[in-house]
Amino acid sequence: MTKIHIYFIFILVGLNSAYAQNLYLKDVYTNEPISFGKIYPEFEKPFLSDIDGKFKLVNVNQNFSVKATSYIDTTITLTNGDSIIFLTPNLKSLENVTVKPGINPAEVIMAKVIANRKKNHPLENDGFISKQYSKYIFDVDQETRKNIFDTIMFPKPDSNIIRARNFLDKQYFFITESASRHFFEPPYKEKEIIDAFKVSGINDPLFSTFAQEMQSFHFYDNQVSVLGKQYVNPIAFGSLNRYLFVLEDSTFNQNDTTYTIYYRPRLNKNFDGLTGRLFINTNGYAIEKVVAEPFNKDTSGIDINIVQEYRFTNNTKWFPYKLSTTIDLKTAMITYGKEKNQSGFLQGKGSTYIESVSFNPKELEKERFNNVSIQTSDKANRISDTTWNRLRQNELNSKELKTYHVVDSFAKAENLDKYLFFAKVLATGKIPVSFFNIDLKRVFNYNAYEKYRFGLGIETSEKLMKPLLFGAYFGYGTGDKTIKYGGYSTLFLNRKTGTKLNLYIQSDVSEVGATKPFFSPGLFSNESLRYLFVSNMAMQEKYGATFSTTIRSNMGIQLDVNRHNLNFKNGYQYNGLSTFNALETSLIWSWNIREKVNLIGNQRVSMGTNYPRFQVQFDRGWIPTDYTEFLSYSRLNLSISQNVTVIGIGKLSWSFKGGMANGNVPLNYFFALQASRQNWSVSVPNSFETVGVNEFYHKKSASVFTRFTFNAIRTKAKWNQPQFGFHYAYGIGEFENKSEHNIEFKSMDKGLHEAGIFLNGLLTSGNSSIGLGSFYRFGYYSNEDWKKNIVPKIVVGFTF
């Protein structure tokens, strides 16, 4: 080797040590990265660190200062080998905002951001394929960690604190990773396939979508989803009137400028808003970085902070590059000492890295899209370590490896999969017992006809037979004093598409004039609440078969063929008869427009939709007569519903129900009105609150229900968040030849009107609320005594 080679090597080594060194900003107590700190070098222009606190100095032989939100300003002189800059939290830092008269420069900038929102939107204009890697770690919160590490320095520290310190030094509480491919084709075709996931202690795909559920993929929609809740975006149309914007800083880059803008909801503005900082780049006035958290803390004890970083990718557009989430689970308390104040809570920190972005690739033309937005591959939990090392951004450190090892061993010893299986079944309203499930919905129920209904339902679980299910139930009503029972068998042909065949036999009550929903109503659904008031029922012996499947992920059909016997118990007769036999076929078609579905293993989880939901049901039946002839009937029923969020104001819910029926048949084969009148009972949306359940029946009818609920008024009391709302319902219908039926009822030939006002949230607790409402019937079918048109009710609300 010549001297020139030796000199050249020395020069390279010297350059490597003096130039272009990667440095990191970290919290002195938690060792966590500090995002978007501003670096002020002595001989260079100021710039920002990235989402992981990483930055690079061209020349490290210089002093520099660092400023970061909520941290003490620090001046640094690097010594040999330094790569981590530790900053100390400024625990007394507050957001002091002074509003001055005149033109607000931040609003001028934000107006340009809002004007360019659609152009910069990642899911507009260009299709793409990208790869993503996510990692989430759960540890003790920052303040608790600081207290533990400070207390350990005392002369005689508590042994519990020593154990806590040793634990926190070696491992975390929980870790999860996932890797996925993201596909998008304009205008709205989108899907994400999770190819790999790994969760400490758990092998179930239920946790595979954890990263996707934490925050939105981008920050450009009118509503931003944070932990499943919707917040008004500060760059949404109209946000200049809703949000206060303050220009804090400007950072000059090579060809453009980055503005740092603080934002929060304006005073006396009542909406679910965010607060944080936007870093706006003058290249297209796009988001370069954003920090956001809910302005009003959640009463559930869960706080969350999100951070996103964008890059001008492939010289085409700004695109998400890194996503970060911090979630504080303040209800998950952790005690580390003997003193009362020696406790903390669980804190999760995670990052998602987006790479290999390709805009409008030819491969996109070969992809098949449906409404399954996220799908977990069948082998995603069986990925080799070699593949994982290739998918990860960085190798796992010793604490992360230790977490996997310890938690996996603990889970295996304690059989955590068994408890997870129990929790999944319990979420469906069933309790697993060995190879069977007990259906809680069959244990107790109430309606105005049966009064208190007690019973038991039991069915086989997947542990016994996966493709086949057998079940049976019985019940007894204290009102009608009659035993009901039934049995069924379900063959799951394809769980992913919801394709199944169900055979059933039952002897049970059935509401006269009811229509069948495509999906079984939930415990707190409007249909379940209305069922409390149903008092006109017939005893029905029925056997048949039902086939159901999904044509698309948001569209399904259900075909039912049955033979049933109706026995009216309340004195009702048609043509002198109270018992009827019928052969019936039913076809139900359901379509939820633009609904997104997550396919996790074999489980389909709806993510909801902001667009209308349609259901069409057609019934065709034949009733044999004494003369060996048949009386035929047909029923066509249409229902449409939608929930619309009016940004910054509230939510509008509306539904339409209409039907047509023909045939000379009993009342059961026509339509009962959706009604729920009873003073001081529970208010039932999408029903006539002032109408008795047996007051109206129709052969043809149409009803519209609307309800607008304003955003909650923020108060200082956690138990009180008042929400004003209005209700209006209208119906019209007809029923000729009422005299053929021996009971008295009306039809809405002249049009039925009612309106109401309510105040919910007088008392709130967690995800539930309670309030009061008053509803009034007016028009042709109102009572001459105006006081009898008023129906007071209790308004309840549940959010999950």
Identify the meaning behind each predicted range.
Residues P41, S65-T77:
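A short, solvent-exposed loop/turn motif at the edges and junctions
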Residues Q21, V28-F43:
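Short, ordered, surface-exposed loop/turn motifs in non-cytosolic proteins
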Residues K229-Y231, E367-F800:
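Exposed, low-structure sequence patches enriched in small/polar residues
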Residues K92, N96, K100-T258, P265-G273, ...:
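Structured extracytoplasmic
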Residues N22, L78-P101:
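Extracellular beta-sheet/turn segments enriched in Thr/Pro/Gly and aliphatic residues
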Residues I34, K56-N63:
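Short Pro-Gly-centered beta-turn/loop motif in secreted/extracellular proteins
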Residues E44-K54:
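Short, acidic Ser/Thr/Gly-rich low-complexity loop/linker segments typical of extracellular
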Residues Q21-V28, G53, I85:
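A short, amphipathic beta-strand motif
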